[in-house]
C-alpha cells in the first residue's frame, strides 16, 4: 500500500511531495484551514495546519541526511511550504518562538531563495527567544528596505547593552509611517484597516500598522523597549 504522502525526486535535483489520498492532498488541507479561520474558528485552523505540518515533517528525511530541496513549482509541494509557513506564524503569534523558528529554519533549508518571505518572521522569532547571534546571521537577508531591520537592531542593542545607538534610531526614523505607528497610543484593526490592508495596493500607513502588529508579539517580551525607543525617535 502506497503512503498517503511520499517524497519523489525530480530530474532537477529537487523533490516533490506527492499526495496519494485525501490526507496527502495538502492543497485541500490548507484550504480547509483557511475556511475554518474565515469562519472564526482560529483554534481549529491552527490545529489543522499543525497536523498537516507534522505529516510533512514525517515524510521528509531526518536532519542528519541533509536538506531536501523542494520543487515549489509543484502545487502539492508548494502547499506543503505554505502550510509550514502558516503553522510557524500560528506558533509565533501564540508565543511559541522556538517551535516557529524550527519550522521556518526547515522551510528555508528546503528552499533558500525564500520565495514565501519566511525570513522576516524568523527574525522576529529569534528576537522573541533572544537568539541574537542567529538574528545577526540573517540580518543581511532582511535587507535595508524594511523598518524591521533597524527595529530589530535597536531591540538587540537595548537588550544586550541597555541602550539604543543614536544612529539606529535615526535609521528607523526614516520610515515615517512606521515611526508614526510606534508613537500611536492604539493600533486599531477595525473594518477600515482590514479593507485597506487586503486591497490590491494598501497604503504605507496600513503596511506600517501590519508590521507593527506582527512585531508587537516579540517586542512585548521586552516591556521597557518601546518606551525607550519612542523617546529617541524624532
Predicted features and spans:
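Long, ordered, amphipathic alpha-helical scaffolds
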Residues: 152-234
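Flexible helix-coil transition and linker loops at the boundaries of alpha-helical arrays
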Residues: 17-21, 53-77, 109-111
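Residue-level signature for tetratricopeptide repeat
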Residues: 35, 90, 123-125, 153-160
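Structural motif corresponding to the intra-repeat A-B loop/turn of tetratricopeptide repeats
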Residues: 39, 94, 129, 160-161
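Structural signature of alpha-solenoid helical repeat junctions
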Residues: 24, 72-79, 96, 114, ...
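Alpha-helical repeat scaffolds
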Residues: 13-18, 45-52, 97-105, 131-144, ...
Amino acid at each position: 500500500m502506497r503512503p498517503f504522502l511520499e517524497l519523489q525526486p525530480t530530474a532537477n535535483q529537487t523533490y516533490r511531495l506527492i499526495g496519494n489520498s485525501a490526507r496527502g492532498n495538502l492543497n485541500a488541507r490548507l484550504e480547509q484551514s483557511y475556511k475554518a479561520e474565515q469562519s472564526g474558528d482560529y483554534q481549529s485552523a491552527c490545529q489543522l495546519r499543525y497536523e498537516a505540518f507534522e505529516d510533512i515533517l514525517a515524510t521528509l528525511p531526518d536532519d542528519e541526511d541533509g536538506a531536501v530541496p523542494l520543487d515549489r513549482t509543484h502545487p502539492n509541494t508548494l502547499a506543503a511550504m505554505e502550510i509550514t509557513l502558516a503553522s510557524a506564524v500560528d506558533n509565533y503569534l501564540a508565543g511559541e518562538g522556538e517551535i516557529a523558528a524550527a519550522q521556518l529554519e526547515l522551510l528555508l533549508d528546503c528552499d533558500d531563495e525564500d520565495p514565501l518571505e519566511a525570513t522576516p518572521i524568523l527574525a522576529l522569532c529569534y528576537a522573541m527567544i533572544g537568539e541574537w547571534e542567529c538574528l545577526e546571521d540573517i540580518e543581511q537577508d532582511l535587507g535595508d528596505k524594511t523598518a524591521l531591520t533597524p527595529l530589530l537592531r535597536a531591540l538587540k542593542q537595548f537588550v544586550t547593552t541597555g541602550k539604543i545607538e543614536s544612529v539606529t534610531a535615526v535609521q528607523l526614523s526614516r520610515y515615517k509611517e512606521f515611526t508614526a505607528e510606534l508613537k500611536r497610543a492604539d493600533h486599531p484593526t477595525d473594518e477600515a484597516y482590514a479593507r485597506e490592508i487586503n486591497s490590491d495596493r494598501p497604503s504605507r500607513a496600513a503596511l506600517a500598522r501590519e508590521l507593527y502588529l506582527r512585531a508587537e508579539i516579540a517586542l512585548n517580551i521586552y516591556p521597557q523597549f518601546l518606551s525607550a525607543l519612542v523617546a529617541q525617535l524624532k
